[in-house]
Amino acid sequence: EAHDLLICLNTRKDIDDPTRMRYTRQEWFKTTQEMIDLFPDLPEAIENTQEITDKVEEYELDSDPLMPVFPIPPELGTEEEYRQKFSQEDLFNEFTRDEKGNVVLTEEEANKKIKKLGGYDRLYRIKLEADYLKELTMKGVVKRYGENPSPEIMERIIFELHIMKTMGFPGYFLIVQDFIRAARDMGVIVGPGRGSAAGSAVAYCLGITNIDPIKYDLLFERFLNPDRISLPDIDVDFDDAGRQQVLEWVTEKYGADKVSHIVTFGSMAAKMAIKDVARVLKLELSEANRLAKMVPEAPKMTLKKAYKENPDLEKEKQSLNPLISKTIQFAETLEGSIRQTGVHACGILISRDPLTDHIPIMPTEGESLMTTQYDGHFVEPIGLIKMDFLGLRTLSIIKTCLDNIKKSKHIVLNENEIPLDDEETFKLFTRGDTTGLFQFESPGMKKHLRALQPNRFEDLVAMNALYRPGPMEYIPSFIRR
C-alpha cells in the first residue's frame, strides 16, 4: 500500500483515481521454483534463463580515473615516440622516486604504485601529459614571478609538478587550465579561486587560480597529498551567463556524448511526507497542516525524533479518524523515500569515453546536455571525472559594473588588476559599509571592522578566519594588538 501511495505521489494522482498507474504486485525477484510454477508449459525458457545466469561473469563498477584525453601538441611528442625514447626502467625511476631523484619506496611499494597508476602503458601517457603541463607551468612562472624566480619558488613548483605527475593527474590540470583560458578568452569573469586549490603554485602559474600561495603561506598538501589518493577538487567560479558559455565550449570540445550533468535525489522529509500522503489520501488541508506543524522545526528532523519532542504527534496514530491514522502510518513508511530528481547545481562530468559505456543517463528538462542516473556519491568511484562549474551572481554583478564603467566613463578595467591596497576600498571596510559583501555583511562583523580599522588585505583575511564560533572570542584581543 505504501508503494502504491508513492506511485501516486510521483505521478501526481489521487489514490482513488481509476486512471492512475497501478502495479501488478508481482514485481519481485522470484525463486527458481516460483518461476517453474508460473511457467510449467515452458521448461525450455526456464533452462535458457538459467543458462544466461550461469554465463554472467563477476565484475565491479569501480574503476581507476577515466581521464579524458587532452590533445598534446605533436611537436612535443607522441606516446609512440615516448615509448621509443624512454625505457620502463626510466619510468620506474621517474615515478617512484622523489622530485630530487632519491629512492623513497621499497621495491614492493614501487611496483604497487606502478600498478595503481595503470601499469607502464598508462605511464607513457601520464609522462607525456606531465611534460606538457611542465612546459605550460614554466611559461606561467615567468608571467607570475619574472624571468629569475627565487630558488624557493622553483623548488615549490618542481615539487608540485612531481606530485601531480606521480599521482597520475597532469591530464586533469591540463583540462581545467584549458577551459579556464577559453572562458577568459570569451570574456567570461572567472573567480580568483577557492578552497584547497588556492594552495597550489602550479595552479597559480597556469591561471587556474589568481592567488599566490607562496606569498600567503598556503599549504599545497591540503590540496594534493600522496598519502591520501583522491582526485583533485577544483571549484571554478564563473559569472552566471558565462557558466553556460563555458559548458557549451566544453561540450563542443569533448563531445555531447561525453559531457553531462549529475543527478540529485530529493528525499521526503518528515513534514513533506505528512503533507504528501495527506494530499493523496484526500485528508482535509487544515488537518494536514495541523499534523505537519506538530513536527518540530529542526535540521534532519525525523518522525521518530518528532515523537520524542512532541508525544501528541505519536498519539495521532491512534486517531479515530482513519485518514489521520493512515496519514501518519504511511508517512512513517515513506519518510526518506526518493521524492524527485534534480540536477546538481555545479557538478559536470567530462568522460574519456561515451558516458553510456559506463553509466546510465537521461534527458535533462529544458537542456540538450544529458544527466546521469547515478548521483555524485557513485560517479567518482566508477572513474568518471567530476568538475565543479559554479555560476556566481556576485561575478555577474562585477561584470555588469565593469561594463557600465566602460560605457559611462570610457575606462576599461580588469578586475584582476585592481590593487589589493586600494585606499577607497579599505574606507568601506573601516566604516563597516559592507552590506551585500559575502562574509562581511553581518552586524557583528561590521562592528568588529569598525573597531579594527583594517588597512591591509591580511587584516581582512584574519578577521574572516576569526569570525566563527570559538575563535570569535579572541577578536577583541586581536584588535587591541
Regions found by a protein language model. Give the residues of each.
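Alpha-helical scaffold/interaction cores of sigma-54-like transcription cofactors
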Residues: 1-481
